[in-house]
């Protein structure tokens, strides 16, 4: 309270959905805002210091006096450069470059300082720094630290923001997490994508300076638009924060264009290869950046084997049928998030080969029931049909039917539809357990060729309806009957919920992600004894799986259950550190602990599967999109009478709002960034209401409607011609409501 000023820090890396390059800048931007809250004029001095860390790999420890010694250090050089409105420390070394800049006019500097005491003494005298303008490593294995300082005066009530920018450029850096076991991943060499755009850290810095207004204003516009949603804050936090995975060491992008995703970031063992049975849960990356989704699908298909298997990991030959089907569904998602059919025509031959492989190997009699030994994301092998992988199979078949129709492969479309038709019937009849009130696994063999199978039997499995989760996101329709689907979801919420209270005696079979008092949902629970050969992770709690289950509940309007799950997850990632002694992560997991709001964990931090959280947004807004058909739709399950939510299309994002009264309904699609071509609009009227006098306006100008119809509560509007909705433009739909 004695400090006469109020100081706040805003730190970010530019994040602009649809703009991949400007969301992949190697930089950190720090805005320090100071406000004079006193009655007198005050003088402020700010100091920023940075070690020249070029050469530090992350594997070793920085040691020695003033912590300037590390294995990769040596030949590090600092140089002060000044120009109008900016002073920088250029930091170079054999491994690349860094740059710390102050975007201000009155900046003092030093290329090197001896120790913290001397730096503080120099700065405290008059708020300015003295020292050499160049410096270099005194010895092999050592580096130097530089600093910048700037000062200004504020009148009472006045405030000012000073921006510091730290940029880096490491063309020879290692990719991925702190893991030496995957250094032979075939695509690791060849530099970083940003080498195609900039030459060094100074080049990066100058790009930021020249484009600062766009980068900052558009990043903030994205944040403002996302949080203009009236969805609860805890849900928006979890939906949006998991995009941090794209900003973490979990992800890399090579100069040649290969987009690599580790399962996570860890200081020990972590798995690479763009793991399909983990990655297919992720939704946020493809919705915010459709270009990334298309790159990943093309990579998946590039790795297809001669027989048609999509390997669990790029460059391998191990199957994982959940990931196999998930990748096929991803192809259809990426098609829907395109502007035309070109992507699909390119991908269809190998996509068809992949679904045909699965049919021939696991469903040779084409009855929709899977047979034989198959691996999955639970790191085990199973045999037979579970509702989990069974629904994924059905959803993949339906997606392939739709894709075949688009490319004109009618014979394939009819074949997939025939298998789907008998498959959903057989699965519904054979997997439903009336006594338990949910679907169960139909195990086939306990052992195949000496390999012990893992079973779920009659477990309430959190992924029980994962294929339906996918199907609803892609508007593929219902798989199992709605009443049984909702009954099964209710059982997941009730049976698998667990709170780790003091004295509960909870002991996870492998890893414990729950702190004392935390609540989560187990992977499996059983009505009786736990089978001896059950899955290893049966009583673990992992958010990536929970989001998928919660979002499926939300898709069916089960708001109490679905939002309960998301709120409990948000409480676990509330910023309170849960470390060893409270949780048990196992050696190959996030041994640092858990609780970070910006890095959810499983087998490591910033876990890829957690990007499934974006599906909650899609479920709450009832989003429907088909870019090539120029179709957009919203059927909110969250407050349809007063709804607001962020949305993305193939090239744009914005805010959707909807209001309903007893006699009228209005919906607005406000584009904030990019452009969308639209010809068809889908909306939902309240139950037992019929729409009348439909009007469509683009920024107040009436648009001609070719036709409109209502099927149940779904209103379909077909415009007479395609309209282009640009940033700053709002498309408004209004109609009367008549009680049936």
Predicted regions: what they are:
Residues 8, 13-27, 31-275, 404, ...:
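Acidic/polar, glycine-enriched structural segments that form the non-catalytic walls/loops
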Residues 29-31, 649-684:
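Carbohydrate-binding surface patches
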Residues 266-311, 324, 345, 349, ...:
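Active-site core of glycosidic bond-cleaving carbohydrate-active enzymes
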Residues 43-51, 672-690:
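Surface-exposed beta-strand/loop patches in extracellular or lumenal glycoproteins
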Residues 367-370:
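Acidic, glycine-anchored loop motifs typical of Ca2+
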Residues 699-720:
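Extracellular/luminal ectodomains and secreted, surface-exposed scaffolds of diverse proteins
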Residues 2-24, 647-659:
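Low-complexity, acidic Ser/Thr/Pro/Gly-rich terminal tails and inter-domain linkers that flank the onset
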């Amino acid at each position: 309270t004695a400090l006469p000023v109020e100081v706040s820090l805003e730190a970010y890396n530019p994040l602009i959905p649809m703009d991949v390059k400007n969301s992949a800048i190697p930089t950190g931007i720090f805005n320090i805002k100071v406000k004079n809250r006193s009655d007198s004029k005050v003088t402020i001095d700010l100091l920023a210091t940075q070690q020249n860390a070029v050469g530090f790999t992350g594997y070793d420890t920085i040691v020695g006096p003033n912590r300037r010694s590390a294995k990769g250090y040596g030949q590090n050089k600092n140089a002060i450069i000044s120009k109008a409105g900016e002073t920088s420390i250029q930091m170079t070394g054999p491994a690349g470059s860094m740059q710390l800049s102050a975007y201000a006019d009155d900046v003092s500097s030093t290329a090197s300082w001896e120790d913290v005491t001397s730096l503080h003494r120099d700065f405290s005298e008059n708020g300015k720094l003295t020292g050499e303008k160049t410096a270099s490593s005194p010895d092999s294995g050592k580096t130097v630290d530089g600093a910048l300082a700037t000062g200004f005066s504020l009148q009472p009530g006045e405030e000012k923001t000073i921006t510091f920018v730290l940029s880096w450029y490491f063309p020879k850096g290692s990719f991925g997490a702190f893991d030496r076991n995957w250094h032979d991943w075939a695509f690791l060499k060849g530099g970083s994508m940003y080498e195609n755009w900039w030459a060094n850290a100074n080049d990066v810095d100058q790009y930021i300076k020249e484009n600062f207004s766009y980068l900052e204003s558009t990043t903030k516009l994205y944040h403002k638009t996302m949080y203009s949603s009236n969805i609860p804050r805890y849900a928006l936090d979890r939906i949006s924060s998991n995009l941090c995975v794209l900003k973490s060491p979990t992800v890399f992008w090579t100069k040649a264009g290969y987009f690599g995703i580790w399962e996570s970031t860890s200081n020990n063992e972590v798995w690479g290869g763009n793991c399909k049975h983990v990655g297919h849960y992720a939704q946020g990356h493809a919705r915010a950046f459709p270009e990334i989704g298309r790159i990943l699908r093309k990579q998946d298909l590039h790795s297809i084997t001669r027989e048609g298997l999509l390997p669990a990991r790029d460059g391998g030959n191990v199957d994982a049928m959940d990931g196999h089907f998930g990748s096929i569904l991803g192809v259809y998602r990426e098609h829907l998030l395109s502007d035309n059919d070109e992507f699909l025509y390119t991908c269809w031959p190998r996509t068809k080969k992949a679904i045909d492989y699965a049919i021939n190997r696991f469903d040779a009699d084409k009855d929709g029931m899977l047979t034989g030994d198959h691996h999955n994301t639970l790191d085990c092998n199973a045999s037979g049909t579970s509702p989990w992988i069974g629904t994924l199979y059905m959803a993949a078949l339906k997606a392939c039917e739709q894709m075949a129709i688009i490319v004109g492969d009618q014979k394939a479309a009819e074949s997939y539809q025939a298998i789907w038709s008998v498959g959903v019937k057989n699965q519904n009849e054979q997997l439903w357990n009336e006594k338990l009130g949910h679907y169960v696994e139909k195990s086939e063999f306990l052992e195949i060729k000496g390999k012990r199978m893992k079973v779920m039997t009659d477990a309430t499995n959190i992924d029980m309806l994962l294929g339906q989760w996918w199907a609803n996101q892609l508007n593929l329709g219902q798989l199992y009957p709605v009443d049984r689907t909702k009954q099964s979801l209710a059982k997941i919420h009730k049976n698998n919920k667990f709170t780790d209270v003091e004295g509960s005696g909870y002991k996870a079979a492998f890893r414990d992600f729950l702190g004392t008092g935390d609540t989560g949902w187990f992977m499996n629970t059983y009505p009786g004894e736990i089978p001896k050969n059950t899955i290893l992770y049966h009583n673990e709690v992992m958010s990536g799986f929970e989001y998928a289950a919660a979002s499926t509940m939300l898709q069916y309007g089960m708001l109490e259950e679905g939002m309960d799950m998301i709120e409990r997850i948000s409480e676990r990632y509330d910023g309170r550190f849960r470390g060893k002694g409270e949780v048990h992560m196992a050696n190959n997991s996030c041994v640092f602990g858990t609780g970070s709001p910006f890095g959810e964990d499983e087998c490591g931090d910033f876990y890829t599967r957690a990007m499934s959280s974006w599906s909650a947004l899609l479920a709450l807004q009832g989003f429907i999109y088909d870019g090539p058909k120029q179709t957009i739709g919203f059927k909110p399950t969250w407050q349809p009478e007063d709804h607001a939510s962020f949305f993305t299309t193939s090239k744009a994002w914005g805010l959707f709002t909807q209001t309903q009264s007893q006699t009228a309904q209005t919906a607005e699609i406000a584009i904030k960034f990019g452009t969308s071509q639209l010809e068809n609009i889908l909306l939902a009227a309240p139950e037992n209401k019929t729409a009348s006098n439909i009007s469509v306006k683009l920024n107040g100008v009436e648009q001609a409607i070719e036709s409109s119809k209502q099927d149940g509560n779904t209103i379909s509007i077909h415009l007479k011609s395609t309209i282009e909705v640009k940033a700053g433009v709002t498309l408004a739909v209004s109609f009367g409501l008549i009680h049936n």
